[in-house]
Amino acid sequence: MSSKKRTKRNRAGDEYKEHKGRSHPRRKFLPPEEPDVSRISKVAGVNQLEELCDSFDQPLHSTAVDACGEEHSENESSGYVPAPQRTNAERSEKMLLETPEGDVHEFSQSGSVREPLMENLNAPNTTRSEVKKKRPSKKSSSDSSVNSPSSVQLWCPNKLKRSSRDITELDVVLAEFEKIAANYRQSIESKACRKAVSAFCSAFEDQVTDLITEVQELKNTKKKNAKVVADIKKKRQRLMQVREKLSRTEPQLIKLQKEYAEVEERRSSLRQVVQFLTDLKELQQDYLDYREENPRKKVVYGASSLPALLVESRRILQAERHFQNINRKLEYALEVQRGKLAKEH
Protein backbone atom coordinates (compact mmCIF):
# COMPACT_ATOMS: atom_id res chain seq x y z
CA MET A 1 0.00 0.00 0.00
CA SER A 2 2.83 2.43 0.85
CA SER A 3 4.59 1.78 -2.48
CA LYS A 4 1.31 2.41 -4.35
CA LYS A 5 0.77 5.65 -2.44
CA ARG A 6 4.34 6.78 -3.21
CA THR A 7 3.92 6.05 -6.92
CA LYS A 8 0.61 7.91 -6.92
CA ARG A 9 2.15 10.92 -5.12
CA ASN A 10 5.11 11.00 -7.50
CA ARG A 11 2.76 10.88 -10.45
CA ALA A 12 0.67 13.71 -8.96
CA GLY A 13 3.84 15.77 -8.33
CA ASP A 14 5.00 15.32 -11.93
CA GLU A 15 1.62 16.37 -13.25
CA TYR A 16 1.65 19.37 -10.87
CA LYS A 17 5.07 20.47 -12.19
CA GLU A 18 3.82 20.15 -15.77
CA HIS A 19 0.76 22.29 -14.97
CA LYS A 20 2.89 24.82 -13.00
CA GLY A 21 5.16 25.40 -15.98
CA ARG A 22 2.22 26.74 -17.97
CA SER A 23 1.46 30.43 -17.45
CA HIS A 24 -1.90 30.33 -19.31
CA PRO A 25 -4.32 27.46 -19.94
CA ARG A 26 -3.80 25.74 -23.29
CA ARG A 27 -5.71 23.31 -25.34
CA LYS A 28 -4.41 19.75 -25.54
CA PHE A 29 -3.18 18.61 -28.93
CA LEU A 30 -4.13 15.01 -29.55
CA PRO A 31 -1.82 12.58 -31.40
CA PRO A 32 -2.76 11.59 -34.96
CA GLU A 33 -4.23 8.26 -33.93
CA GLU A 34 -6.75 9.86 -31.53
CA PRO A 35 -10.04 11.37 -32.74
CA ASP A 36 -10.23 15.00 -33.86
CA VAL A 37 -11.35 17.82 -31.55
CA SER A 38 -14.48 18.36 -33.61
CA ARG A 39 -15.77 14.95 -32.54
CA ILE A 40 -15.73 15.86 -28.86
CA SER A 41 -19.12 17.54 -29.12
CA LYS A 42 -20.65 14.18 -30.03
CA VAL A 43 -19.30 12.45 -26.92
CA ALA A 44 -21.32 12.30 -23.71
CA GLY A 45 -21.26 15.23 -21.25
CA VAL A 46 -19.03 13.37 -18.84
CA ASN A 47 -16.20 13.04 -21.37
CA GLN A 48 -16.56 16.71 -22.33
CA LEU A 49 -16.12 17.76 -18.71
CA GLU A 50 -13.06 15.51 -18.42
CA GLU A 51 -11.37 17.19 -21.40
CA LEU A 52 -12.24 20.66 -20.07
CA CYS A 53 -10.96 19.98 -16.57
CA ASP A 54 -7.70 18.61 -17.97
CA SER A 55 -7.16 21.81 -19.97
CA PHE A 56 -6.95 24.00 -16.83
CA ASP A 57 -4.12 24.18 -14.31
CA GLN A 58 -4.26 22.69 -10.88
CA PRO A 59 -4.40 25.10 -7.91
CA LEU A 60 -0.84 26.27 -7.26
CA HIS A 61 -0.72 25.45 -3.59
CA SER A 62 1.83 23.19 -1.96
CA THR A 63 -0.44 21.96 0.82
CA ALA A 64 -3.20 21.14 -1.64
CA VAL A 65 -0.82 18.93 -3.63
CA ASP A 66 0.74 17.26 -0.59
CA ALA A 67 -2.48 16.62 1.28
CA CYS A 68 -4.70 15.82 -1.68
CA GLY A 69 -2.11 14.30 -3.98
CA GLU A 70 -3.45 10.83 -3.35
CA GLU A 71 -6.99 11.80 -4.41
CA HIS A 72 -5.75 13.59 -7.55
CA SER A 73 -3.60 10.63 -8.54
CA GLU A 74 -6.46 8.19 -8.06
CA ASN A 75 -8.82 10.30 -10.16
CA GLU A 76 -6.27 10.79 -12.91
CA SER A 77 -5.35 7.08 -13.01
CA SER A 78 -9.00 6.12 -13.32
CA GLY A 79 -9.58 8.80 -15.99
CA TYR A 80 -12.80 10.07 -14.41
CA VAL A 81 -13.43 13.24 -12.37
CA PRO A 82 -16.58 13.22 -10.23
CA ALA A 83 -19.05 16.07 -10.51
CA PRO A 84 -18.65 17.54 -6.97
CA GLN A 85 -14.88 17.63 -7.37
CA ARG A 86 -15.20 19.43 -10.71
CA THR A 87 -17.49 22.05 -9.25
CA ASN A 88 -15.12 22.59 -6.30
CA ALA A 89 -12.16 22.97 -8.62
CA GLU A 90 -14.04 25.44 -10.75
CA ARG A 91 -15.11 27.34 -7.65
CA SER A 92 -11.55 27.44 -6.26
CA GLU A 93 -10.14 28.76 -9.52
CA LYS A 94 -12.65 31.63 -9.66
CA MET A 95 -12.07 34.92 -7.92
CA LEU A 96 -14.26 38.01 -7.75
CA LEU A 97 -12.65 41.41 -8.01
CA GLU A 98 -14.79 44.45 -7.27
CA THR A 99 -13.73 47.81 -8.64
CA PRO A 100 -14.49 51.14 -6.88
CA GLU A 101 -17.22 51.81 -9.49
CA GLY A 102 -19.07 48.72 -8.29
CA ASP A 103 -18.40 46.43 -11.30
CA VAL A 104 -17.69 42.82 -10.52
CA HIS A 105 -15.32 40.77 -12.69
CA GLU A 106 -14.84 37.04 -12.40
CA PHE A 107 -11.38 35.59 -13.00
CA SER A 108 -9.71 32.24 -12.64
CA GLN A 109 -6.57 31.72 -10.51
CA SER A 110 -4.45 31.03 -13.57
CA GLY A 111 -5.36 34.42 -15.04
CA SER A 112 -7.99 33.42 -17.66
CA VAL A 113 -11.76 34.02 -17.80
CA ARG A 114 -14.11 31.07 -17.33
CA GLU A 115 -16.45 30.65 -20.29
CA PRO A 116 -19.36 28.26 -20.39
CA LEU A 117 -18.46 24.66 -21.02
CA MET A 118 -20.25 24.22 -24.33
CA GLU A 119 -18.76 27.43 -25.78
CA ASN A 120 -15.33 26.30 -24.68
CA LEU A 121 -15.76 23.01 -26.49
CA ASN A 122 -17.41 24.29 -29.65
CA ALA A 123 -15.27 27.42 -30.19
CA PRO A 124 -11.86 27.11 -28.50
CA ASN A 125 -10.20 29.72 -30.70
CA THR A 126 -12.77 32.38 -29.91
CA THR A 127 -12.44 31.61 -26.22
CA ARG A 128 -8.70 32.19 -26.35
CA SER A 129 -9.13 35.53 -28.12
CA GLU A 130 -11.73 36.61 -25.57
CA VAL A 131 -9.34 35.72 -22.77
CA LYS A 132 -6.65 37.91 -24.31
CA LYS A 133 -9.07 40.78 -24.69
CA LYS A 134 -10.40 40.56 -21.13
CA ARG A 135 -7.02 40.14 -19.48
CA PRO A 136 -6.22 43.91 -19.26
CA SER A 137 -9.54 44.50 -17.55
CA LYS A 138 -8.41 42.17 -14.79
CA LYS A 139 -5.20 44.11 -14.30
CA SER A 140 -6.96 47.43 -14.22
CA SER A 141 -9.61 46.20 -11.82
CA SER A 142 -7.08 44.53 -9.56
CA ASP A 143 -4.90 47.63 -9.60
CA SER A 144 -7.87 49.83 -8.79
CA SER A 145 -8.98 47.55 -5.99
CA VAL A 146 -5.50 47.55 -4.49
CA ASN A 147 -4.91 51.24 -4.95
CA SER A 148 -8.31 52.25 -3.61
CA PRO A 149 -8.08 52.95 0.15
CA SER A 150 -11.39 51.19 0.84
CA SER A 151 -10.20 47.84 -0.53
CA VAL A 152 -7.10 47.57 1.71
CA GLN A 153 -7.51 46.54 5.33
CA LEU A 154 -4.95 48.13 7.67
CA TRP A 155 -3.60 45.61 10.20
CA CYS A 156 -3.10 47.46 13.48
CA PRO A 157 -1.88 45.65 16.64
CA ASN A 158 -2.74 46.78 20.13
CA LYS A 159 0.67 48.20 20.97
CA LEU A 160 1.28 50.14 17.77
CA LYS A 161 -0.66 53.10 16.40
CA ARG A 162 -0.98 53.16 12.63
CA SER A 163 -2.64 55.53 10.20
CA SER A 164 -3.51 55.43 6.52
CA ARG A 165 -0.06 56.82 5.72
CA ASP A 166 1.58 53.70 7.16
CA ILE A 167 0.10 51.32 4.56
CA THR A 168 2.81 49.16 2.98
CA GLU A 169 2.97 46.39 0.43
CA LEU A 170 2.74 43.85 3.24
CA ASP A 171 -0.73 45.13 4.19
CA VAL A 172 -1.89 44.74 0.60
CA VAL A 173 -0.38 41.26 0.41
CA LEU A 174 -1.99 40.23 3.70
CA ALA A 175 -5.43 41.51 2.68
CA GLU A 176 -5.34 39.80 -0.72
CA PHE A 177 -3.96 36.62 0.80
CA GLU A 178 -6.81 36.47 3.32
CA LYS A 179 -9.38 36.90 0.55
CA ILE A 180 -7.81 34.24 -1.66
CA ALA A 181 -7.32 31.87 1.27
CA ALA A 182 -10.95 32.28 2.35
CA ASN A 183 -12.23 31.55 -1.16
CA TYR A 184 -9.91 28.60 -1.55
CA ARG A 185 -10.80 27.21 1.89
CA GLN A 186 -14.50 27.30 1.02
CA SER A 187 -13.87 25.38 -2.18
CA ILE A 188 -12.23 22.45 -0.37
CA GLU A 189 -14.41 19.64 0.93
CA SER A 190 -11.76 17.48 2.58
CA LYS A 191 -11.22 18.22 6.27
CA ALA A 192 -7.55 17.27 6.13
CA CYS A 193 -6.96 19.68 3.27
CA ARG A 194 -8.81 22.40 5.12
CA LYS A 195 -6.70 21.86 8.21
CA ALA A 196 -3.51 21.94 6.16
CA VAL A 197 -4.59 25.09 4.33
CA SER A 198 -5.64 26.74 7.61
CA ALA A 199 -2.30 25.88 9.23
CA PHE A 200 -0.37 27.23 6.25
CA CYS A 201 -2.49 30.40 6.15
CA SER A 202 -2.10 31.05 9.87
CA ALA A 203 1.67 30.54 9.70
CA PHE A 204 1.95 32.83 6.69
CA GLU A 205 -0.26 35.48 8.31
CA ASP A 206 1.82 35.31 11.50
CA GLN A 207 5.00 35.87 9.51
CA VAL A 208 3.50 38.77 7.57
CA THR A 209 2.06 40.39 10.70
CA ASP A 210 5.43 40.03 12.44
CA LEU A 211 7.08 41.70 9.47
CA ILE A 212 4.49 44.49 9.52
CA THR A 213 5.08 45.00 13.25
CA GLU A 214 8.84 45.08 12.80
CA VAL A 215 8.57 47.50 9.88
CA GLN A 216 6.25 49.79 11.85
CA GLU A 217 8.50 49.65 14.91
CA LEU A 218 11.47 50.47 12.69
CA LYS A 219 9.59 53.44 11.23
CA ASN A 220 8.64 54.66 14.71
CA THR A 221 12.22 54.21 15.91
CA LYS A 222 13.52 56.15 12.92
CA LYS A 223 11.04 58.95 13.59
CA LYS A 224 12.03 59.08 17.25
CA ASN A 225 15.70 58.96 16.28
CA ALA A 226 15.19 61.81 13.82
CA LYS A 227 13.43 63.85 16.51
CA VAL A 228 16.21 63.15 19.01
CA VAL A 229 18.87 64.08 16.43
CA ALA A 230 17.02 67.30 15.63
CA ASP A 231 16.73 68.15 19.34
CA ILE A 232 20.41 67.40 19.87
CA LYS A 233 21.31 69.59 16.91
CA LYS A 234 19.20 72.48 18.24
CA LYS A 235 20.66 72.12 21.72
CA ARG A 236 24.18 71.97 20.30
CA GLN A 237 23.61 75.18 18.35
CA ARG A 238 22.16 76.79 21.45
CA LEU A 239 25.19 75.64 23.45
CA MET A 240 27.57 77.19 20.89
CA GLN A 241 25.64 80.46 21.04
CA VAL A 242 25.75 80.45 24.84
CA ARG A 243 29.49 79.75 24.80
CA GLU A 244 30.10 82.66 22.42
CA LYS A 245 27.99 84.92 24.58
CA LEU A 246 29.81 83.75 27.71
CA SER A 247 33.21 84.42 26.15
CA ARG A 248 32.09 87.93 25.24
CA THR A 249 30.59 88.69 28.67
CA GLU A 250 33.38 87.14 30.75
CA PRO A 251 35.50 90.37 30.98
CA GLN A 252 32.41 92.32 31.94
CA LEU A 253 31.65 89.72 34.58
CA ILE A 254 35.14 90.06 36.08
CA LYS A 255 34.82 93.84 36.14
CA LEU A 256 31.40 93.67 37.77
CA GLN A 257 32.72 91.24 40.37
CA LYS A 258 35.47 93.67 41.33
CA GLU A 259 33.01 96.54 41.59
CA TYR A 260 30.70 94.40 43.67
CA ALA A 261 33.53 93.53 46.05
CA GLU A 262 34.41 97.22 46.48
CA VAL A 263 30.80 98.17 47.07
CA GLU A 264 30.42 95.42 49.64
CA GLU A 265 33.53 96.59 51.44
CA ARG A 266 32.27 100.16 51.53
CA ARG A 267 28.92 99.01 52.72
CA SER A 268 30.42 97.01 55.56
CA SER A 269 32.65 99.93 56.62
CA LEU A 270 29.66 102.26 56.49
CA ARG A 271 27.73 99.91 58.72
CA GLN A 272 30.60 99.84 61.19
CA VAL A 273 30.85 103.65 61.24
CA VAL A 274 27.13 104.03 61.78
CA GLN A 275 27.25 101.54 64.61
CA PHE A 276 30.23 103.30 66.21
CA LEU A 277 28.54 106.69 66.02
CA THR A 278 25.35 105.38 67.56
CA ASP A 279 27.35 103.79 70.40
CA LEU A 280 29.31 107.00 70.95
CA LYS A 281 26.16 109.05 71.04
CA GLU A 282 24.65 106.73 73.62
CA LEU A 283 27.81 106.93 75.70
CA GLN A 284 27.85 110.71 75.61
CA GLN A 285 24.21 110.85 76.58
CA ASP A 286 24.89 108.55 79.51
CA TYR A 287 27.79 110.74 80.62
CA LEU A 288 25.69 113.90 80.50
CA ASP A 289 22.95 112.24 82.47
CA TYR A 290 25.47 111.15 85.09
CA ARG A 291 26.95 114.68 85.37
CA GLU A 292 23.52 116.15 85.91
CA GLU A 293 22.80 113.68 88.64
CA ASN A 294 26.23 114.10 90.33
CA PRO A 295 27.58 117.58 89.55
CA ARG A 296 30.01 117.77 92.56
CA LYS A 297 31.85 114.59 91.86
CA LYS A 298 35.18 114.88 90.19
CA VAL A 299 35.75 113.33 86.89
CA VAL A 300 38.15 110.44 87.12
CA TYR A 301 39.78 109.18 83.97
CA GLY A 302 41.02 105.67 83.84
CA ALA A 303 42.95 103.65 81.28
CA SER A 304 39.82 103.19 79.27
CA SER A 305 39.44 106.99 79.02
CA LEU A 306 42.78 107.65 77.30
CA PRO A 307 41.27 107.90 73.80
CA ALA A 308 38.76 110.41 75.07
CA LEU A 309 41.52 112.40 76.83
CA LEU A 310 43.59 112.48 73.70
CA VAL A 311 40.66 113.78 71.70
CA GLU A 312 39.97 116.39 74.38
CA SER A 313 43.62 117.43 74.53
CA ARG A 314 43.74 117.86 70.79
CA ARG A 315 40.69 120.06 70.97
CA ILE A 316 42.25 122.14 73.75
CA LEU A 317 45.55 122.44 71.90
CA GLN A 318 43.79 123.58 68.79
CA ALA A 319 41.97 126.24 70.80
CA GLU A 320 45.28 127.41 72.36
CA ARG A 321 46.92 127.70 68.99
CA HIS A 322 43.99 129.67 67.70
CA PHE A 323 44.26 132.15 70.58
CA GLN A 324 48.01 132.51 70.03
CA ASN A 325 47.45 133.39 66.39
CA ILE A 326 44.90 136.02 67.36
CA ASN A 327 47.35 137.51 69.93
CA ARG A 328 50.13 137.77 67.36
CA LYS A 329 47.91 139.54 64.89
CA LEU A 330 46.80 142.03 67.54
CA GLU A 331 50.40 142.77 68.59
CA TYR A 332 51.38 143.34 64.99
CA ALA A 333 48.47 145.70 64.47
CA LEU A 334 49.44 147.71 67.61
CA GLU A 335 53.04 148.07 66.52
CA VAL A 336 51.97 149.38 63.13
CA GLN A 337 49.65 151.90 64.71
CA ARG A 338 52.42 153.11 67.11
CA GLY A 339 54.82 153.62 64.22
CA LYS A 340 52.35 155.80 62.36
CA LEU A 341 51.76 157.97 65.44
CA ALA A 342 55.49 158.45 65.96
CA LYS A 343 56.00 159.66 62.41
CA GLU A 344 53.23 162.21 62.78
CA HIS A 345 54.75 163.81 65.84
Curated annotation (Swiss-Prot):
Keyword Nuclease: no
Entry superkingdom: Eukaryota
UniProtKB keywords: Centromere, Chromosome, Coiled coil, Nucleus
Span of the annotated motif Nuclear localization signal: 222-239
InterPro entries to which the protein is assigned, alphabetical: CENP-U
Location in the cell: Nucleus; Chromosome, Centromere
Ranges of Basic and acidic residues composition bias in the record: 88-106
Amino acid composition bias (Basic residues), ranges on this chain: 1-10, 19-29
Pfam families: CENP-U
Coiled coil: 201-294
Annotated region described as Disordered, given as residue ranges: 1-37, 64-153
Low complexity composition-biased segments: 142-152
Role played: Probable component of a centromeric complex involved in assembly of kinetochore proteins, mitotic progression and chromosome segregation. Required for maintenance of sister chromatid adhesion during mitotic checkpoint activation.
Family: Belongs to the CENP-U/AME1 family.
Record protein name field: Centromere protein U
Lineage start: Eukaryota, Metazoa, Chordata, Craniata, Vertebrata
Gene that this polypeptide is encoded by: CENPU
